[in-house]
Regions:
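Bacterial N-terminal signal peptides that target proteins for export
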Residues: 1-7
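N-terminus-centered regions that define maturation/targeting leaders and the start
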Residues: 19-185
C-alpha cells in the first residue's frame, strides 16, 4: 500500500508545483457566467447584428518561459462560418515585462502598453473586434498569448495581416498560454 501511495503523493506534489509555475493567461473581467460582458461584444456599426460596446477585455498572465523577450496576443473564433475562422484581435510586440492588458484598449492604441502594436484583424482594421456569432450557434473564442524569443516581430506594421503575424509568431515561439470563451446569441 505504501509503495502505491508514494508515487501518487509525489505525482500530486509535482503536478501542483508545475501548475504554480505554468505559463497562464486569464480573463480578468468576464460576465457572471464567465463569458463576455455586453460591453465586450461587437458594436452595431460593424453591421453583423450585435449592439455591444466593442471594448476589449482585461487580461493578465504569469510565469512566461525563460528567455521571453515579447508576447503576441490573438483572439480567434474557430467556429466563424468562413471556412477559415475569424481573427478578432491581434496585439504584437507586447514588452516582456508587461503582465496585463487593461480593459478598453482603443483601436488607435489608447491604453496599450508602450511598444505594443495592434495589427489588422479579419474586420480589416487594427484593434479589438468583439464577439458576434450568428444567432443560434455557440462559437468558441480562443485567446492565445505566445511568448517570443525576439523583442519585435520582423516586418510587422499595423497593416500586417493576421497570417503574417502568425507566421513570424510561430517562427519565434517559446510557448503559449490560452483559454477559450464560449458565446452564443
Amino acid at each position: 500500500m505504501q509503495t502505491r501511495i508514494l508515487p501518487t503523493v509525489l505525482l500530486a506534489f509535482s503536478t501542483a508545483a508545475f501548475a504554480e509555475s505554468a505559463f497562464t493567461l486569464q480573463f480578468d473581467n468576464p460576465s457572471k457566467d464567465g463569458g463576455f460582458t455586453q460591453n465586450q461584444l461587437l458594436s452595431a456599426p460593424y453591421g453583423f447584428g450585435c449592439s455591444g460596446g466593442n471594448a476589449s477585455p482585461a487580461l493578465s498572465w504569469k510565469n512566461p518561459p525563460a528567455g521571453t523577450k515579447s508576447f503576441v496576443l490573438t483572439v480567434y473564433d474557430k467556429d466563424a462560418p468562413t471556412g477559415l475562422g475569424w481573427m478578432h484581435w491581434v496585439v504584437a510586440d507586447i514588452p516582456a515585462d508587461v503582465r496585463r492588458l487593461p480593459a478598453g484598449i482603443t483601436a488607435q492604441g489608447g491604453r496599450l502598453p508602450k511598444g505594443a502594436l495592434q495589427t489588422r484583424t479579419d474586420f480589416g482594421t487594427p484593434g479589438y473586434g468583439g464577439a458576434c456569432p450568428p444567432e443560434g450557434r455557440e462559437h468558441r473564442y480562443e485567446f492565445t498569448l505566445t511568448a517570443l524569443k525576439v523583442a519585435k516581430l520582423p516586418n510587422i506594421t499595423a497593416e500586417s495581416t493576421p497570417a503574417l503575424v502568425g507566421f513570424f509568431t510561430r517562427a519565434n515561439s517559446l510557448g503559449e498560454a490560452k483559454f477559450t470563451v464560449e458565446h452564443r446569441r
